[in-house]
Swiss-Prot record:
Pfam families: AAA_25 (PF13481). It comes from the Bacteria. Disulfide bonds: none annotated. This is Regulatory protein RepI. This protein is involved in regulating the plasmid copy-number. Increasing the level of this protein results in a higher plasmid copy-number.
Length: 93
């Protein structure tokens, strides 16, 4: 687990910060984010496609190279049949 040291405000004013690590544009690695839009817009499919790519699958979204590693996909609102349909559709590409 990452630990964070306190920030000295005077040192922060004087020294340039280290670069940020992004998972996607404007999505900083190690932070909590939200994917928000009206129902039916494709949020679940987007999340599943990103999860598949990060797990080592193809770049279906053409977002470019992403870091790879273990993924946990937690679709809290969808029944298993809906997830199966999405996975089957992804597998067709």
């Amino acid at each position: 687990m990452a630990t964070h040291k306190p920030i000295n405000i005077l040192e922060a004013f004087a020294a340039a910060p280290p670069p940020l690590d992004y998972v996607l544009p404007n999505m900083v690695a190690g932070t909590v984010g939200a994917l928000v839009s009206p129902g039916g817009a494709g949020k679940s499919m987007l999340a599943l496609q990103l999860a598949a790519q990060i797990a080592g699958g193809p770049d279906l979204l053409e977002v470019g190279e992403l870091p790879t590693g273990p993924v946990i996909y937690l679709p809290a609102e969808d029944p298993p049949t809906a997830i199966h349909h999405r996975l089957h559709a992804l597998g067709a590409h």
